[in-house]
Every structure is written in C-alpha cells, then in structure tokens.
C-alpha cells in the first residue's frame, strides 16, 4: 500500500510538539478587532494547544507527523 499523503493545508497551519500535542494559531484575529475586548486580542496572540478532540482530527491529516 502506498504512503498516505499529508494534507497541504494542515501542514501549513499546525505543528506537532515534542510531547505529541498540536499547536495552532488562535482563531478570530483576521478582522473585526475593533469590537473585540482587549483581553480577547491579548489572549489570541501567538499560538495555543488544541483540545484533545480537535487534535485527534488534525493527526489524521498529518499521518507522517510534520
């Protein structure tokens, strides 16, 4: 059987940490920041670790562990 291909969209958006967790950028930061609270803007800065349910789905898109 041939190797499974990695989803190109997923490899651009997610990183796997050394412990196997999935890191991604926080959502909701593209536009409309004027109506967001300062706390939301601060908390959405940088990256976050995905929840276990979401990480399980993303790992299917990254079979070779990029």
From Swiss-Prot:
Indicate the secretion signal residues: none
- Database matches in SUPFAM superfamilies: L35p-like
A GO molecular-function annotation: structural constituent of ribosome
Q: Which GO BP terms sit in this record?
A: translation
Q: Which domain of life is it from?
A: Bacteria
Span-the-membrane segments of this chain are: none
Give UniProt keywords alphabetically.
Ribonucleoprotein, Ribosomal protein
Listed Pfam families: Ribosomal_L35p
- PROSITE patterns linked to this entry: RIBOSOMAL_L35 (PS00936)
Which Gene Ontology terms of cellular component type are present? cytosolic large ribosomal subunit
Q: Which InterPro entries would you find in this protein's record?
A: Ribosomal_bL35, Ribosomal_bL35-like, Ribosomal_bL35_CS, Ribosomal_bL35_sf
The UniProt similarity line reads: Belongs to the bacterial ribosomal protein bL35 family.
Which PANTHER family does the entry link to? 54S RIBOSOMAL PROTEIN BL35M, LARGE RIBOSOMAL SUBUNIT PROTEIN BL35M
Q: What is this protein called?
A: Large ribosomal subunit protein bL35
Task: Give the organism the record lists.
Answer: Brucella anthropi (strain ATCC 49188 / DSM 6882 / CCUG 24695 / JCM 21032 / LMG 3331 / NBRC 15819 / NCTC 12168 / Alc 37)
